[in-house]
């Protein structure tokens, strides 16, 4: 049973039936998974109450390749919804059809985008300030992917969540599916 359209997209497992995975176990599962895909490595893993989140980068370029979610109880690994699927010009679902927001003849899957990482950070800050006008907001350095940036942010000194900024349009996509931050581990 799911929690609805915007809720958890996987089967919730009550804690009394299945024990929650720890971050090290999730890292091992992710390493095994990406070893079958080829030239990728894990950049970071974050643990939230609803899932584990991982940034996967290309070994040869260091560029963000894609984002994955891991169910904290079953260990099922899935592509993260949102920008990872819709804006990712190289590994997303539009990589064969080209990006739907930009004419195909104007862009290919390279690392160049009209919006810089600093501009993406400013766009993210402005967006968050409109939602949390009285909070102390700090936006961390963005992770760069093919077509967009993903940024973690803090409210009042604590990691609160993340959002993505399209590198061509400046559109913001808030990651509402993670819930409360627990911990993170940087790997590269």
Describe each region flagged by the PLM.
Residues 1-188:
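Long, terminal "pre-/pro-" and other extracytoplasmic accessory regions
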């Amino acid at each position: 049973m799911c929690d609805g359209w915007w809720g958890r997209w996987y089967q919730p497992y009550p804690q009394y039936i299945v024990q929650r995975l720890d971050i090290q176990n999730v890292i091992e599962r992710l390493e095994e998974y990406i070893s079958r895909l080829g030239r990728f490595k894990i950049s970071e893993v974050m643990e939230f109450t609803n899932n584990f989140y991982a940034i996967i980068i290309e070994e040869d370029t260091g560029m963000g390749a894609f984002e994955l979610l891991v169910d904290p109880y079953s260990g099922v690994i899935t592509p993260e919804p949102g920008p990872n699927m819709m804006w990712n010009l190289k590994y997303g679902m539009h990589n064969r059809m080209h990006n739907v927001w930009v004419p195909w003849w104007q862009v290919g899957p390279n690392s160049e985008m009209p919006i810089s990482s600093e501009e993406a950070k400013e766009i993210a800050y402005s967006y968050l300030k409109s939602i949390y006008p009285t909070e102390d907001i700090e936006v961390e350095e963005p992770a760069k992917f093919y077509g967009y940036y993903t940024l973690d942010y803090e409210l009042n000194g604590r990691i609160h969540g993340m959002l993505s900024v399209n590198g061509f349009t400046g559109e913001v996509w808030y990651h509402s599916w993670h819930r409360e931050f627990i911990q993170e581990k940087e790997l590269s």
